[in-house]
């Protein structure tokens, strides 16, 4: 979209300074309109020349097409925000580590008891496995 704008400005500057300005200004108006109104740019118009022309009207505000300015002014702010979000995520994981560890120990003890009942381990191995680590 910017490229089309810059090309149009360059053509206008060259046309103004040349003797062919009148010829260029009488170009078919539909040609310029077709170049601008194509594909996605149709959804991004901010101004409409004719309010009755629904073809160029901005889409309804459904939250999907709305364009907003970014909330961050620099990459450092984005980096800080991502670090904060990462730290919150890490703190949640560390907060759950006690429960996760207890669950893993319970599963290991159950597996050790099942192995002892099937005869895969001895009584001494069972006692050593069930002893609390130092």
Swiss-Prot record:
The places in or outside the cell where this protein is found are: Secreted; Host cytoplasm; Host nucleus
Q: Which GO terms describe its cellular component?
A: extracellular region; host cell cytoplasm; host cell nucleus
The signal peptide, as residue positions, is 1-21
Expression induction or repression: Expression is strongly up-regulated during the early stages of infection.
**Region Disordered, residue ranges:** 49-70
Keyword line: Host cytoplasm, Host nucleus, Secreted, Signal, Virulence
- Asked whether the keyword Secreted is assigned, the reply is yes
Which residue ranges does the UniProt annotation give for the motif RxLR-dEER? 44-68
Q: Upon deletion of the gene, what happens?
A: Inhibits ethylene induction and promotes P.sojae infection in soybean.
Start-end of Basic and acidic residues biased regions: 61-70
Q: Where is this protein chiefly located? A: secreted
Q: Where are the transmembrane segments?
A: none
What is the UniProt domain comment for this protein?
The RxLR-dEER motif acts to carry the protein into the host cell cytoplasm through binding to cell surface phosphatidylinositol-3-phosphate.
Quote additional remarks.
Answer: Avh238 is highly polymorphic among P.sojae isolates.
How this chain assembles, per its entry, is:
Interacts with host 1-aminocyclopropane-1-carboxylate synthases ACS1, ACS2, ACS3, ACS10 and ACS12.
Family of the protein in this entry: Belongs to the RxLR effector family.
Q: What does this protein do, in the record's words? A: Effector that suppresses plant defense responses during the early stages of pathogen infection. Suppresses cell death induced by effectors and PAMPs in plant hosts. Is able to induced cell death in tomato, tobacco, eggplant, and potato, but not in A.thaliana. Interacts with and destabilizes host 1-aminocyclopropane-1-carboxylate synthases. By suppressing type2 ACS-catalyzed ethylene biosynthesis, Avh238 facilitates Phytophthora infection.
Q: What is this protein called?
A: RxLR effector protein Avh238
Give the species: Phytophthora sojae (strain P6497) (Soybean stem and root rot agent)
Could you read off the lineage of the organism from its UniProt record? Eukaryota, Sar, Stramenopiles, Oomycota, Peronosporales
């Amino acid at each position: 979209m910017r490229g089309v704008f810059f090309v149009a400005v360059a053509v206008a500057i060259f046309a103004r300074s040349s003797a062919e300005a009148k010829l260029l200004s009488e170009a078919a108006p539909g040609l310029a309109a077709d170049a601008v109104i194509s594909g996605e740019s149709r959804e991004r118009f901010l101004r409409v020349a004719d309010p009755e022309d629904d073809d160029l009207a901005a889409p309804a505000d459904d939250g999907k097409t709305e364009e907003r300015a970014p909330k961050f002014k620099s990459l450092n702010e984005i980096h800080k925000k991502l670090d904060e979000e990462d730290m919150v995520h890490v703190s949640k994981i560390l907060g759950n580590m006690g429960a996760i560890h207890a669950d893993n120990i319970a599963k290991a003890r159950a597996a050790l008891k099942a192995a002892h009942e099937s005869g895969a381990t001895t009584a001494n191995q069972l006692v050593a496995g069930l002893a609390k680590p130092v």
